[in-house]
C-alpha cells in the first residue's frame, strides 16, 4: 500500500502546477461559452480587464511614489556641496596646524606622535567626495522612510506584473494544445465556394492554436512594432529623468554610471523584444494576440500616467 502511494506524492507538485494552468484554460473556455464572445475579442478584453484590476493600481501607486522620490532627491542635492565644503575646511585647518607645529625649533616626542596622527586623519579629495555622497544617501534614506516612499517598494509592481504575464501566457499555451476553432463566429459550409465566403467566415474557420499561415510575418511585425515603440518611449523617459533620479550624475554623460545603467537596461529590453518576435513566429494566434494586447495596454497606460503624474525634469 505504501509503495503504491509514493508516485502520487512524488508528482503532486508537478500535477498542481499543471492543474493551475489547466484551470486558467478551463476558465477561458467557460467564459467563452457563457458570453458568446469570439476568441479574438475575448482575449483582448480579458487582458485589459486583468491589467486594469491587478497592475493599473500598482502602476499608479508606483508612479506617485517615484515622483515623490524625485522631489525628495532634489531636497538632498544640496547636501554634498555643504559636506564637501566642511570637510575641505577641516582638512585645510589641520594642514595649517601641521605647518605651524612643524615650524617650531624643537618638537617633543608627544608633538611628533600627534602630528603623525593628524596626518592620518587628513582626507583626500576622493575621500571627501565619497563621504559627501554617503551622507547624502543617509539623509535620502531617512526622508524616504519619513514620507513612506522606500526604494524597496519599487519592486512590488514587477513582482506582480511578470508572474501575471507568465501565468497568462502558460495558461493560453495550455488552451491551445489542441485544435481551437471559434464556435462563436460564422462558419462556411463545406460545399460553399471560397469566393462567396466573407472575411468573418474566413476568420471563424481559422485554427487559433496554430500560427497564422496565410500571413506568417504579420503578427510578429505588429508585435515587434508595438513592443519597440513601447521600449523606445520608456527609454526616452528614463534618459530624460535620469538627472532628477540620480541627484548627482547626469544621463547626458555617456561615461556616468547612470547613463551606462540606462543603456544596459534598454539594450537588454531590445534584445528580449527581438527574442519575443522570433518566438511569436511559432506561437499560436491566440497567444500572440495576448502579447500584442498587453503591449498596447502598457503603451496607453504609460501615456496616461505621463499626462497625469509626469516625472520631474
UniProtKB/Swiss-Prot annotation:
Transmembrane residues, as ranges? 209-229, 273-293
* One Gene Ontology MF term: membrane insertase activity
Is this entry keyworded DNA damage?
no
Matching entries from InterPro entries are given as: YidC/ALB3/OXA1/COX18
| Keywords in alphabetical order | Membrane, Mitochondrion, Mitochondrion inner membrane, Transit peptide, Transmembrane, Transmembrane helix
- Mitochondrial intermembrane compartment segments: 294-313
Member of which family?
Belongs to the OXA1/ALB3/YidC family.
What's its job?
A: Required for the insertion of integral membrane proteins into the mitochondrial inner membrane. Essential for the activity and assembly of cytochrome c oxidase.
The protein's name:
Cytochrome c oxidase assembly protein COX18, mitochondrial
Q: Upper lineage ranks? A: Eukaryota, Fungi, Dikarya, Ascomycota, Saccharomycotina
Amino acid at each position: 500500500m505504501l509503495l503504491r502511494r509514493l508516485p502520487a506524492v512524488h508528482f503532486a507538485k508537478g500535477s498542481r502546477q499543471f492543474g493551475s494552468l489547466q484551470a486558467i484554460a478551463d476558465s477561458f473556455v467557460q467564459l467563452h461559452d457563457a458570453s458568446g464572445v469570439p476568441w479574438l475579442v475575448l482575449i483582448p478584453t480579458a487582458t485589459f480587464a486583468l491589467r486594469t484590476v491587478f497592475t493599473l493600481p500598482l502602476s499608479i501607486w508606483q508612479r506617485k511614489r517615484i515622483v515623490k522620490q524625485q522631489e525628495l532627491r532634489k531636497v538632498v542635492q544640496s547636501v554634498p556641496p555643504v559636506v564637501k565644503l566642511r570637510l575641505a575646511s577641516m582638512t585645510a585647518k589641520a594642514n595649517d596646524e601641521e605647518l605651524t607645529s612643524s615650524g617650531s625649533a624643537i618638537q617633543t616626542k608627544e608633538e611628533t606622535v600627534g602630528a603623525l596622527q593628524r596626518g592620518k586623519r587628513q582626507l583626500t579629495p576622493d575621500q571627501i567626495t565619497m563621504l559627501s555622497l554617503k551622507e547624502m544617501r543617509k539623509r535620502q534614506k531617512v526622508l524616504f522612510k519619513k514620507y513612506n516612499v522606500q526604494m524597496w517598494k519599487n519592486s512590488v509592481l514587477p513582482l506582480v506584473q511578470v508572474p501575471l504575464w507568465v501565468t497568462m501566457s502558460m495558461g493560453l499555451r495550455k488552451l491551445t494544445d489542441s485544435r481551437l476553432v471559434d464556435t462563436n463566429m460564422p462558419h462556411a459550409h463545406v460545399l460553399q465556394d471560397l469566393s462567396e465566403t466573407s472575411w468573418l467566415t474566413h476568420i471563424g474557420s481559422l485554427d487559433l492554436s496554430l500560427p497564422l499561415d496565410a500571413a506568417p510575418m504579420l503578427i510578429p511585425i505588429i508585435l515587434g512594432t508595438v513592443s519597440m515603440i513601447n521600449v523606445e518611449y520608456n527609454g526616452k523617459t528614463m534618459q530624460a529623468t535620469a538627472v532628477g533620479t540620480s541627484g548627482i550624475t547626469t544621463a547626458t554623460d555617456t561615461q556616468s554610471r547612470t547613463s551606462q545603467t540606462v543603456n544596459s537596461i534598454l539594450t537588454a529590453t531590445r534584445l528580449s523584444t527581438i527574442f519575443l518576435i522570433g518566438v511569436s513566429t511559432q506561437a499560436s494566434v491566440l497567444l500572440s494576440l495576448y502579447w500584442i494586447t498587453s503591449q498596447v495596454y502598457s503603451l496607453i497606460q504609460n501615456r496616461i500616467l505621463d499626462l497625469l503624474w509626469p516625472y520631474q525634469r
